[in-house]
Curated annotation (Swiss-Prot):
UniProt: S-adenosyl-L-methionine binding residues: T74, D95, N123, A124
Function field: Methyltransferase required for the conversion of demethylmenaquinol (DMKH2) to menaquinol (MKH2) and the conversion of 2-polyprenyl-6-methoxy-1,4-benzoquinol (DDMQH2) to 2-polyprenyl-3-methyl-6-methoxy-1,4-benzoquinol (DMQH2).
The protein's annotated pathway: Quinol/quinone metabolism; menaquinone biosynthesis; menaquinol from 1,4-dihydroxy-2-naphthoate: step 2/2; Cofactor biosynthesis; ubiquinone biosynthesis
Keyword Cytoplasm: no
Enzyme Commission number(s) of this protein: 2.1.1.163, 2.1.1.201
Annotated catalysed reactions: a 2-demethylmenaquinol + S-adenosyl-L-methionine = a menaquinol + S-adenosyl-L-homocysteine + H(+); a 2-methoxy-6-(all-trans-polyprenyl)benzene-1,4-diol + S-adenosyl-L-methionine = a 5-methoxy-2-methyl-3-(all-trans-polyprenyl)benzene-1,4-diol + S-adenosyl-L-homocysteine + H(+)
Gene: ubiE
PROSITE patterns the UniProt entry points to: SAM_MT_UBIE, UBIE_1, UBIE_2
Keywords noted in UniProt: Menaquinone biosynthesis, Methyltransferase, S-adenosyl-L-methionine, Transferase, Ubiquinone biosynthesis
The protein, known as: Ubiquinone/menaquinone biosynthesis C-methyltransferase UbiE
GO molecular-function terms, A-Z: 2-methoxy-6-polyprenyl-1,4-benzoquinol methyltransferase activity; demethylmenaquinone methyltransferase activity
Entry-linked Pfam families: Ubie_methyltran
Length: 251
């Protein structure tokens, strides 16, 4: 782990000023936004769709509810939630990055998903919504990019209704030694090459690999959610722990 102080944080394996991280992450996603969906399919061999489907199946979202898809990017989860909540419900796709938000908006409008879906540029650490507003919040592959994760979790807790749930889908720690070694080799040697060939940006995908290693492991994130106020916090390891889905409730 990289040593940190309250004034510094990690950006991949680098130590940077905490105030600078959001801008550096923004540069990464401005760079890859146009190829984001294609790269997700290529680098996960399409398995990210199964991870997201499992998240949706675990959400418990029903007709008429209000859902926040945080760090929603190009809108894979928001599109499904829009259909699930129906005309009387509401889905907000929020992302701090305007390039990702623009592509998500265009993609979903081209799919004919309008009416109950709104778009908000927002920082997860200071969500611009009232207290007790959402029935469900999801954040998929976004929490590791947040500078102050504890602050972001508290912000999510604040805007979640009593009885509501948070689902955090994120890269995590493989549970088997052989899988971990193979995953490291793929992440650090093959993934940046794919990024260079397809998105013309190997550095951003090298950051991706590093940011995954710096993200809290399954048990640590579970404890962070509990510290933010969430109860009955559990997680499921997916694909041997390469990804984990954490769930917590506000009572």
């Amino acid at each position: 782990m990289v040593d940190q102080t309250p004034e510094t944080t990690h950006f991949g394996y680098k130590t940077v000023a905490a105030a600078d991280k959001a801008g550096k992450v923004a540069q990464v996603f401005h760079s890859v936004a146009g190829k984001y969906d294609l790269m997700n399919d290529l680098m996960s061999f399409g398995i990210h769709r199964l991870w997201k489907r499992f998240t949706i199946d675990c959400s418990g979202v029903r007709q008429g509810q209000r859902v926040l898809d945080l760090a929603g990017g190009t809108g894979d989860l928001a599109a499904r939630f829009s259909r699930m909540v129906g005309e009387q419900g509401e889905v907000i796709l929020a992302d701090i990055n305007d390039s990702m938000l623009k592509i998500g908006r265009e993609k979903l409008r081209n799919m004919g998903i309008v009416g109950n879906l709104n778009y908000v540029q927002a920082n997860a650490e200071a969500l611009p919504f009232p207290e007790n507003y959402f029935d469900c919040i999801t954040i998929a592959f976004g929490l590791r990019n947040v500078t102050d994760k504890d602050k972001a979790l508290r912000s999510m807790f604040r805007v979640l209704k009593p009885g509501g749930r948070l689902l955090v889908l994120e890269f995590s720690r493989p549970q088997f030694v052989a899988l971990s070694k193979a995953y490291d080799a793929y992440s650090f040697h093959i993934l940046p090459r794919i990024g260079e060939m397809v998105a013309h940006d190997g550095d951003s995908y090298r950051y991706l690999a590093e940011s995954i290693r710096m993200h809290p492991d399954q048990e640590t994130l579970k404890g962070m959610m509990a510290a933010a106020g969430f109860e009955n916090t559990t997680y499921d390891n997916l694909t041997g722990g390469i990804v984990a889905l954490h769930r917590g409730y506000k009572f």
